[in-house]
Amino acid sequence: MNLKQLAGEYAANFVNDGMKIGLGTGSTVYWTIQKLGERVKEGLSFQAVPTSKETEALAQQLNIPLISLNDVQSLDLTIDGADEIDSNLQLIKGGGGALLREKIVASSSKKLIIIADESKLVTHLGTFPLPIEIIPFSWKQTENKIQSLGCQTTLRLKNNETYITDNNNMIIDCIFPNHISNPVHLHTQLKMITGVVETGLFISMTSTAIIGTKNGIKKL
């Protein structure tokens, strides 16, 4: 069993009968969803809000009951992955392109459980490119303003074409040469730029991190 599978399957144990949960997106959450599909076959009853079309399709294949976030006041918990996790449980997310929906669902949840393998633990955020979702209109102007904060930017592509999110937006991936020293301040600066929809910085949102390590599960 690989470390992503270890963390992903373990997190499925947090889901109990009657819960309303958020299901994240990515290669680690894939294992959570697979395990939850097995538990549905065994009789577990819960409802889930998917954070992407990819997750929605997988959940439907496994007969996991899906609901809209519009139909609930809050979710009991959300299980999602991360691209980087620092010692304060601040995150970079969005490598899979679903950061906006992931953040909306996470912010509507009583608990956010982050799952990852130990390679995602970092001292400072910023080695992994920070994704920023922007609207397509005048995207180059928005990119220039983002660059003025001191980062190198790349417009995300897929199959040599501009990557389009599930919300019909674009993603700019940003590298900060000296890492991200103050994630809270940077998030605020980015959100003040007109054209920026959301950032991949998840600040003070994580309740628990479940890390798959060579020595087993580690909880943060």
Curated annotation (Swiss-Prot):
Enzyme Commission designation: 5.3.1.6
Record's keyword terms, sorted: Isomerase
Organism of derivation: Bacillus cereus (strain ATCC 14579 / DSM 31 / CCUG 7414 / JCM 2152 / NBRC 15305 / NCIMB 9373 / NCTC 2599 / NRRL B-3711)
HAMAP family xref list: Rib_5P_isom_A (MF_00170)
InterPro entries xref list: NagB/RpiA_transferase-like, Ribose5P_isomerase_typA_subgr, Ribose5P_isomerase_type_A
Pathway, per record: Carbohydrate degradation; pentose phosphate pathway; D-ribose 5-phosphate from D-ribulose 5-phosphate (non-oxidative stage): step 1/1
SUPFAM superfamilies for this protein: D-ribose-5-phosphate isomerase (RpiA), lid domain, NagB/RpiA/CoA transferase-like
Top-level division of the source organism's lineage: Bacteria
Subunit structure: Homodimer.
Gene Ontology molecular function: ribose-5-phosphate isomerase activity
Active-site residues from the entry: 102 (proton acceptor)
Catalyses which reaction(s): aldehydo-D-ribose 5-phosphate = D-ribulose 5-phosphate
UniProt binding sites for substrate: 25-28, 80-83, 93-96, 120
Example of a GO biological process term: pentose-phosphate shunt, non-oxidative branch
Protein's recorded name: Ribose-5-phosphate isomerase A
Family to which the UniProt record says this protein belongs: Belongs to the ribose 5-phosphate isomerase family.
Function recorded in the entry: Catalyzes the reversible conversion of ribose-5-phosphate to ribulose 5-phosphate.
Entry-linked PANTHER family: RIBOSE-5-PHOSPHATE ISOMERASE
